[in-house]
Amino acid sequence: MDGSKHPSVFQKLHGQSYLINRLSPSVQARGYCVSGAYVNGGLQSLLQPTSHGVGSSLIPHGSFPVLAHAPSEKTGTGFLIDFLMGGVSAAVSKTAAAPIERVKLLIQNQDEMIKAGRLSEPYKGISDCFARTVKDEGMLALWRGNTANVIRYFPTQALNFAFKDYFKRLFNFKKEKDGYWKWFAGNLASGGAAGASSLLFVYSLDYARTRLANDAKAAKKGGQRQFNGMVDVYKKTIASDGIVGLYRGFNISCVGIVVYRGLYFGLYDSLKPVVLVDGLQDSFLASFLLGWGITIGAGLASYPIDTVRRRMMMTSGEAVKYKSSLQAFSQIVKNEGAKSLFKGAGANILRAVAGAGVLAGYDKLQLIVLGKKYGSGGG
């Protein structure tokens, strides 16, 4: 089959580095992917052309961070415009999907909330979580934690711009010269290294977002919240646990980058030449459905990692903590069953659809108004 007709995702995103979540995301994912875990931003690497100078990079999530989009190599005004417009696009997509994201986080972490006495009884499902949250906290509470999630985009993009050239030179394998597996391993390594480097700086924002989103009004504690806002999360966590409290779950998050990245791009490169043939090659719907299927599949496969890292985050400030990600994994499976690792996965799938739909519409609006598309963070 003619390789020029079916370029790999890395060829399409030539010159771009890949950073991680939530995890997240995002994954686009959106974004640890998948993050969400990495679901939200993953679709955009299929939907957005690179002729406009915008690539895609894995960022934790939210989901795990999902996926964030990096401006191409440019300086001055061009970079600033792409940077700011990408921020607007990220704010639009993240804010639109924020209610689903909060429900996902509440369902995913409800067992830790019950242990801490901050949730009276388990949620029965997505609709029950929506209804109880609105009833107990009000409609605006569905956006709790969204500010930290939107703010996270900007340092992520700046770090992406700073790290991408270094890791591009360090892991500069060519598929034609070095072979597929060496090229694939190099891309996994570069994505993991760049993702971990970026994550080191923005992880505390994802931590703050997670704690705020899971800060339901506690029935057993007089309806009081644990945190009064993002700054309060930092102050209370540092006071009780020190800086390390802001980075609980960091190691497993870095593993999640590589796992999601390998699944996503491995599936993409394998399925694209088989599925997108003939008339489907330029079909928006076909690309959308393929991207959605791949991000959902990779996101579900890596979702337990996102659950473990977020459950570890939830123990900062608590008397009993997990000693490691392996202990967290084994205790969750032993005490709650393996299905507990997938709590909130249904909401994560809905978030992927909502985020992708909003971004597709926003891309069209940008083309009409500004004559070009700008990238966004999907995580």
Curated annotation (Swiss-Prot):
Record has rRNA-binding as a keyword: no
Annotated Solcar repeat ranges: 77-170, 182-274, 282-368
Stretch list, region Important for transport activity: 309-314
GO cellular component, one term: mitochondrion
Activity regulation, free text: The matrix-open state (m-state) is inhibited by the membrane-permeable bongkrekic acid (BKA). The cytoplasmic-open state (c-state) is inhibited by the membrane-impermeable toxic inhibitor carboxyatractyloside (CATR).
Transit peptide: 1-69
Keywords carried by this UniProt record: Antiport, Membrane, Mitochondrion, Mitochondrion inner membrane, Repeat, Transit peptide, Transmembrane, Transmembrane helix, Transport
Membrane topology (UniProt): Multi-pass membrane protein
Catalysed reactions, semicolon-separated: ADP(in) + ATP(out) = ADP(out) + ATP(in)
TM helices/strands, residue ranges: 79-106, 147-171, 180-200, 250-271, 285-305, 345-365
Residues that, per the record, bind ADP: 152, 164, 309
Localization per record: Mitochondrion inner membrane
InterPro entries to which the protein is assigned, alphabetical: ADT_euk_type, Mit_carrier, Mitochondrial_sb/sol_carrier, Mt_carrier_dom_sf
Gene Ontology biological process terms from the UniProt entry: mitochondrial ADP transmembrane transport; mitochondrial ATP transmembrane transport; purine nucleotide transport
Subunit field text: Monomer.
Family note: Belongs to the mitochondrial carrier (TC 2.A.29) family.
Physiological role: ADP:ATP antiporter that mediates import of ADP into the mitochondrial matrix for ATP synthesis, and export of ATP out to fuel the cell. Cycles between the cytoplasmic-open state (c-state) and the matrix-open state (m-state): operates by the alternating access mechanism with a single substrate-binding site intermittently exposed to either the cytosolic (c-state) or matrix (m-state) side of the inner mitochondrial membrane.
Protein name listed in UniProt: ADP,ATP carrier protein 3, mitochondrial
